[in-house]
């Protein structure tokens, strides 16, 4: 298949690219001329500006030509001498009927460029895919069984944990009760209980009692004195 049409398009785009590069070069020289202190700055500035505008016009014209050529050859293959069709990006290849023959020819050429694949290689690839799928299924089954085992183990261990927790709670509550009794004892110790003591002191006597005691004492003294007098009389 001839590729002159495609090559022409590539050459045209390359020329446009070169013109854009030269345009940028001329713009840089224009700024250098403007910043220099030569006497003929005005003439050189004008000539370089004219060259820049001419390059811009050529680039615009060439781009418009390429856009026109691509627009004319989109979806058809009889607009150029090589019969090349330009496909847009959004074209559905399954539903279009334009350029089907050319498309099939290009696919055959691509298949010819690829190395041939033997049947043994195809079988090896299919066997490897099958083994990989079997391994994936085994791993999935193992994961499911592991999840089931964990669920059963959790269902068994949960009652044991609940029993342990209840036993721990009862153990924790019993020391609390004992401590409460001890606290009561500590709050009211036996030594600090106010027990009324038996009074060992003699009962207090009033003022009248004191007078009676003094009178009794005087009587006793008088008796003693009389006894002493009697003894002296006996002795004499």
UniProtKB/Swiss-Prot annotation:
<dbReference type="GO" id="GO:0016592">
    <property type="term" value="C:mediator complex"/>
</dbReference>
<comment type="similarity">
    <text>Belongs to the Mediator complex subunit 11 family.</text>
</comment>
<dbReference type="InterPro" id="IPR019404">
    <property type="entry name" value="Mediator_Med11"/>
</dbReference>
<feature type="compositionally biased region" description="Acidic residues">
    <location>
        <begin position="226"/>
        <end position="236"/>
    </location>
</feature>
<keyword id="KW-0539">Nucleus</keyword>
<dbReference type="Pfam" id="PF10280">
    <property type="entry name" value="Med11"/>
</dbReference>
<comment type="subunit">
    <text>Component of the Mediator complex.</text>
</comment>
<feature type="compositionally biased region" description="Basic and acidic residues">
    <location>
        <begin position="136"/>
        <end position="152"/>
    </location>
</feature>
<keyword id="KW-0805">Transcription regulation</keyword>
<keyword id="KW-0804">Transcription</keyword>
<dbReference type="GO" id="GO:0006357">
    <property type="term" value="P:regulation of transcription by RNA polymerase II"/>
</dbReference>
<comment type="function">
    <text>Component of the Mediator complex, a coactivator involved in the regulated transcription of nearly all RNA polymerase II-dependent genes. Mediator functions as a bridge to convey information from gene-specific regulatory proteins to the basal RNA polymerase II transcription machinery. Mediator is recruited to promoters by direct interactions with regulatory proteins and serves as a scaffold for the assembly of a functional pre-initiation complex with RNA polymerase II and the general transcription factors.</text>
</comment>
<dbReference type="GO" id="GO:0003712">
    <property type="term" value="F:transcription coregulator activity"/>
</dbReference>
<keyword id="KW-0010">Activator</keyword>
<feature type="region of interest" description="Disordered">
    <location>
        <begin position="136"/>
        <end position="236"/>
    </location>
</feature>
<protein>
    <recommendedName>
        <fullName>Mediator of RNA polymerase II transcription subunit 11</fullName>
    </recommendedName>
</protein>
<feature type="compositionally biased region" description="Basic and acidic residues">
    <location>
        <begin position="168"/>
        <end position="186"/>
    </location>
</feature>
């Amino acid at each position: 298949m001839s590729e002159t049409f495609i090559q022409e398009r590539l050459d045209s785009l390359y020329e446009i690219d070169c013109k854009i590069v030269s345009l940028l070069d001329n713009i840089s020289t224009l700024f250098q001329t403007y910043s220099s202190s030569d006497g003929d700055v005005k003439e050189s500035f004008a000539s370089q500006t004219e060259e820049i505008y001419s390059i811009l016009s050529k680039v615009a014209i060439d781009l418009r030509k390429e856009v026109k050529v691509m627009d004319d050859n989109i979806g058809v293959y009889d607009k150029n001498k090589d019969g090349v069709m330009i496909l847009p990006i959004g074209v559905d290849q399954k539903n279009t009927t334009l350029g089907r023959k050319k498309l099939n020819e290009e696919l055959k050429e691509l298949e010819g460029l690829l190395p041939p694949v033997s049947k043994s290689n195809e079988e090896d690839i299919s066997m490897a895919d099958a083994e990989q799928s079997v391994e994936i299924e085994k791993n999935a089954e193992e994961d499911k069984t592991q999840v089931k085992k964990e669920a059963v183990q959790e269902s068994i261990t949960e009652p044991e944990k609940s029993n342990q927790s209840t036993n721990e709670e009862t153990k924790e509550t019993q020391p609390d009760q004992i401590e409460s009794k001890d606290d009561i004892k500590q709050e009211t110790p036996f030594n600090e209980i106010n027990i009324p003591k038996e009074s060992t002191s003699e009962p207090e006597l009033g003022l009248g009692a004191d007078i009676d005691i003094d009178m009794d004492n005087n009587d006793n003294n008088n008796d003693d004195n009389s006894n002493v007098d009697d003894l002296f009389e006996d002795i004499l």
